[in-house]
C-alpha cells in the first residue's frame, strides 16, 4: 500500500491549490475527485439524463463510463472533458447528481481503483470518510464564506470566465447546503482528520503545515 493523503473540505477552501502543490513537492500522484464528478455529470447531461431520470437509464449510462485522470485533466471514454467542467453550472450539476447513491458508488469505486497501491494526494468532499478511510493522513480544509467567494471569483477570472460575485456566492451556498445535507456521505471531517482553517493563512503557510504532518506520519 502506498502513502495516501486525503484532503477534504467545502468548495473553494483551497483543496486543489494545496493538493497540487503537495503532490509536486512530495513527488506523489494527484487526483481531484471533484473533477471526476463534474465530468460524469456533464457526460450524463449530454446523454439527455438528469438526476430525476429513471434509475435503470442512469445505471445503463454509468456502465459505459470509463474515467481517467491524468496530469490534471479528466477524460470520459477517452474524451477530454476538462474544459467542459469549469463553469459554475457544472459544479451545481455535479452536486445534484452526487445525491444519487448509484452515481457516488460508481465513482467511489473508480476513485479507489485509481488510488490503489499509489503514493497519492486525493482531494474532494468525502475522501477521508468514504473513499480512503484508511489514508495515512487526513486533512480537512475550511475557510470563511467570504474568503471562499474571493478565491472562487479569482479562479473563474483566471480562466477567462465572466462570472459575477453574486453568482459565485449563490453557487457556494448551494453547494454547501447540498454537501452538508445529503443523506449519502455528507460533508464532514473524518474523526481522525486534522482540521485547518485557511481563512487568514497563505498558501505556503498551509503547505508547510501539511508537509510537517506528512513528515511526522511517515516517521511513525
UniProtKB/Swiss-Prot annotation:
Q: Which GO terms describe its biological process?
A: nucleobase-containing small molecule interconversion; pyrimidine nucleotide metabolic process
| Principal location listed in the UniProt entry | cytoplasm
**Superkingdom as given in the UniProt entry:** Bacteria
Q: Which residues bind ATP?
A: 9-17
Keywords (alphabetical) are:
ATP-binding, Cytoplasm, Kinase, Nucleotide-binding, Transferase
Which InterPro entries does the entry mention? Cytidylate_kin (IPR003136), Cytidylate_kinase_dom (IPR011994), P-loop_NTPase (IPR027417)
MF term (GO), any: ATP binding
Kindly list the GO CC terms recorded for this protein.
cytosol
This protein is called what?
A: Cytidylate kinase
